[in-house]
Design a protein with these regions (language model features):
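C-terminal capping region of solenoid repeat domains
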Residues: 2-45, 207-229, 234-303, 307-482
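N-terminal adaptor-interaction module of cullin-RING ubiquitin ligase components
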Residues: 1-163, 168-226, 237-242, 249, ...
Length: 482
């Protein structure tokens, strides 16, 4: 009785020493009613406004730790937060439809310090054109990373104008675009800090006879990674690859043409390569042996190159003694086997990861790998007709450092799993898939003998459910397909 609740919010005036030119959010405090018979009095208690006293740099750090959705919500609080959030944004991904052109001035006036930009367009829509890309480059002169996906309306002229405005670019990734060699050369000639270049399905390069060579340009001195995927006439990038003396990683996938001769020239000129991926290329032992000049080679991926044999692998292994990761998928060609793997075991003693798909090693090579490669921690054997219980038992007994093992589509049975449960003391994860002779009873065996081991078991056969299973048993870290 005698009390009333007021809904009016009273804001206090800021002290003169706290006032500044920036706009601060206004805070209100609860009104505390004082009980009096006929007159209600209110006392206003002012809470300190610590947030508004934070410098812009500190506020930006807070925003950077938030999710994208939370950042958007924060930008609606006040004008200052909107400005700071826009200036501190590190990455922006946009639907690159043609109507984006009209939004460029307002959008990039807010995000005027953006370092990373992704522009994606779907196949059924008309993408942005040269005018929009040039407008973006004028607003984002500090851009260091650009990703273009299906921007089919961009031409060589647009890429050239972009390169003139964004000379600090360090990373460029483009896929399903239609500009050609002139546009790519403009990037290489105007972006001396470019370190990473990824090109996928560049439609502007069609005729091999008339195609303009790409590179090397000013970017050749700084490039460290080049990835080419599904590029017709990818050999046009030969001058760029050869001229990139500091190149560390080269990835070639599904690029047409014969690559043997070019790989030989590349290996002779670019000897500092540490990682090479060759996938679905027309390459033979000549091309596979070429990286033998790269004495610092640490990672080699050889995927679906049916013309490569043990001969090429031996030549590479004899000189590339720092090899740490070897990935071989020969697509059931059965031309790489014990001879090549024995050479790897003899010369590549630093091997840490080995993935064999469609390869048929026997106990001979596996035992030598286990004995010599004492640092081997990750091993995958997939689609092999020769990896059975004997080979798995050998691995269990000899691979002391092994931490992760994957076995798929191999003639392994419960006997091999039992040997595995008793061996490999440092093993932390095992994956067994589509090995039909392995039963789900191995799950109990691993649980009893190696309780901390993470096991993923899928034999490919339906599993009969046990009604008595469960109860107080701890949950197993085993994936069972039913």
């Amino acid at each position: 009785m005698g009390q009333s609740t007021s809904t009016a919010l009273i804001t206090s005036r800021r002290d003169s020493h706290l006032s500044s030119q920036r706009s601060k959010p206004k805070f209100t405090v609860p009104i505390i009613p004082m009980e009096v018979e006929e007159l209600t009095e209110y006392v206003l208690v002012e809470a300190p406004d610590y947030i508004s006293d934070l410098p812009d740099e500190c506020l930006a750090c807070v925003f950077q730790s938030l999710s994208s959705g939370d950042r958007k919500c924060c930008s609606l609080v006040c004008r200052r937060w909107l400005r700071v959030e826009g200036q501190s944004r590190q990455r922006l991904s946009l639907n690159a439809h043609s109507d984006l052109l009209h939004l460029v001035p307002s959008l990039f006036s807010r995000f005027d310090a953006l370092p990373k930009l992704c522009l994606k367009c779907d196949r059924r829509s008309v993408s942005i054109g040269d005018e929009a890309l040039v407008a973006i480059s004028i607003h984002c002169r500090n851009l260091t990373r650009l990703k273009l996906r299906a921007c089919r309306e961009l031409t060589d002229s647009g890429m050239a104008a972009f390169a003139q405005n964004c000379k600090a670019l360090k990373k460029l990734s483009c896929g399903s675009c239609t500009f050609g060699a002139k546009g790519m050369n403009a990037i290489l000639d105007n972006c001396p800090s470019l370190e990473y270049l990824s090109v996928k399905r560049l439609r502007g390069i069609t005729d091999a006879a008339t195609a303009e060579p790409i590179g090397p340009g000013l970017a050749a001195a700084s490039l460290k990674t080049i990835c080419l995927k599904e590029v017709y006439n990818g050999q046009c990038f030969g001058p760029l690859i050869i001229g990139s003396k500091n190149l560390k990683t080269l990835k070639l996938s599904r690029c047409s043409g014969d690559w043997d001769k070019l790989l030989q020239v590349i290996a002779d000129r670019v000897t500092g390569l540490a990682e090479i991926h060759l996938e679905r290329l027309q390459v033979s032992d000549t091309g596979l042996a070429a990286p033998s000049n790269c004495l610092n080679l640490e990672i080699l991926h050889l995927v679906k190159t049916p013309e490569c044999t043990d001969t090429g692998l031996v030549s590479m292994a004899e000189r590339c003694r720092l090899l740490r990761k070897l990935y071989i998928d020969i697509w059931k060609a059965n031309r790489i086997g014990d001879d090549g793997l024995v050479a790897v075991a003899k010369h590549c003693l630093n091997l840490q990861e080995l993935v064999l798909i469609g390869v048929n090693p026997t106990q001979i090579s596996l035992e030598l790998l286990a004995s010599n490669c004492q640092k081997l921690e990750r091993l995958a054997l997939c689609g092999s007709d020769t990896v059975g219980d004997v080979e798995i038992s050998c691995i269990a007994a000899k691979c002391v450092a092994l931490k992760k093992l994957c076995i798929k589509n191999c003639p392994v049975s419960d006997h091999g799993m039992e040997a595995l449960a008793n061996g490999c003391p440092n093993l932390v994860k095992v994956k067994v898939k589509n090995c039909r002779a392995v039963t789900y009873g191995c799950a109990d065996l691993f649980r009893i003998k190696r309780g901390s081991l993470a096991v993923n078991l899928d034999s490919g056969e339906p599993r009969h459910q046990d009604a008595s299973a469960g109860g107080g048993v701890a949950q197993e870290n085993i994936a069972r397909k039913s």
